[in-house]
């Protein structure tokens, strides 16, 4: 699985509203790691009650893929190395 970049816009299964990805590999309060953190699209971040943790397999449709460059690719590569250590 390749993680989508921040800024990507997706629709989750059985959801009415699109989400924009604002974070990747985020932990919830119990320490469980999710692939993405998202906020409503097109509104953006409203408050902490309107952000959503979800996994790649929850995505039904990808409307837009966010910006990708060498900086992001190096970040993802380093992140993958750290995850393999655990």
Regions found by a protein language model. Give the residues of each.
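Short, well-ordered loop/turn sites that connect or cap secondary structure elements
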Residues: 3-4, 13
């Amino acid at each position: 699985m390749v993680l989508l970049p921040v800024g990507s816009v997706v629709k989750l299964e059985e959801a009415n509203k699109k989400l924009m990805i604002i974070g990747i590999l985020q932990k919830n309060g119990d320490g469980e790691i999710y692939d993405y953190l998202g906020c409503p699209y097109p509104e953006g971040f409203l408050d902490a009650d309107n952000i959503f943790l979800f996994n790649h397999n929850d995505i039904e449709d990808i409307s837009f893929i966010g910006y990708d460059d060498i900086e992001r690719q190096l970040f993802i590569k380093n992140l993958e190395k750290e995850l393999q250590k655990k």
